[in-house]
């Protein structure tokens, strides 16, 4: 189905075709959340505003269900925000038993995929080419950051339940290994030590 929206004033009506479908902040990996979840796109925007760059150490001592750290990892690995709904993984993420909303999957797609022009062969090919280019970029970044350690991304939270949620969300986001996260009070938390080359702590 194609979703149509109308904005009505006293003198005119404006018709919009919804080319997005489900809200774009819904990446498809977060089906568990804490009491005050941060929207995924807001977390990504804040990270960009701080000037953080992939490869730099990022430590979130109050990580909650992991929104900041997962968005950062996806940036580092060149994973497009809509990768899951675009069907760029072999299998969709499986929702947990604590899911608070249905997961966005490749079956949802984007709103524009239901518009008639998208069914033309040229548009279909352009869509395939875009996804293949994105996948190539993702593969290149996986070689650059082959493990969770190489990402230099870690976090902690005093709430054990949120730490568990973070681990589940990390896996559903198709990120490598298990996240570097532990249950710890933010006032006592310290980022993991990362000695320079040739230096070992004993």
Which sequence ranges carry the predicted segments?
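Non-catalytic substrate-recognition/targeting regions of SAM-dependent transferases
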Residues: 1-29
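Beta-sheet entry/capping signal
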Residues: 3, 12-14, 55-60, 152, ...
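Short, solvent-exposed polar/charged micro-motifs at secondary-structure junctions
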Residues: 5-7, 190-193
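Generic structural hydrophobic/aromatic packing signal, biased to beta-strands
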Residues: 6, 15-17, 72, 153, ...
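Class I SAM-dependent methyltransferase Rossmann-like catalytic core
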Residues: 28-41
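Conserved S-adenosyl-L-methionine
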Residues: 38-189
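Amphipathic alpha-helical repeat scaffolds
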Residues: 169, 201-202
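A short acidic, Gly/Pro-enriched loop at the edge of an enzyme's catalytic core
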Residues: 191-201
């Amino acid at each position: 189905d194609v979703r149509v929206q109308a904005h009505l004033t006293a003198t005119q009506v404006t018709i919009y075709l919804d080319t997005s479908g489900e809200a774009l902040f819904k990446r498809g990996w977060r089906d568990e959340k804490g009491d005050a979840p941060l929207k995924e796109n807001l977390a990504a925007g804040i990270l960009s505003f701080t000037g953080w760059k992939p490869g730099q150490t990022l430590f979130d001592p109050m990580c909650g269900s992991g929104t900041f750290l997962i968005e950062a990892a996806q940036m580092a690995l060149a994973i497009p925000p809509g990768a899951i709904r675009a069907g760029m993984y072999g299998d969709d993420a499986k929702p947990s038993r604590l899911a608070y909303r249905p997961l966005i999957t490749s079956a949802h797609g984007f709103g524009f995929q239901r518009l008639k022009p998208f069914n033309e062969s040229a548009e279909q090919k352009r869509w395939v080419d875009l996804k293949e280019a994105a996948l190539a970029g993702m593969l290149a970044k996986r070689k650059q950051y082959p493990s969770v350690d190489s990402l230099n991304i870690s976090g902690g939270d005093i709430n054990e339940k949120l730490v568990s949620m973070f681990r589940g969300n990390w896996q559903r986001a198709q990120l490598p290994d298990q996240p570097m996260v532990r249950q710890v009070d933010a006032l006592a938390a310290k980022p993991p030590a990362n000695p320079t080359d040739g230096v070992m702590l004993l």
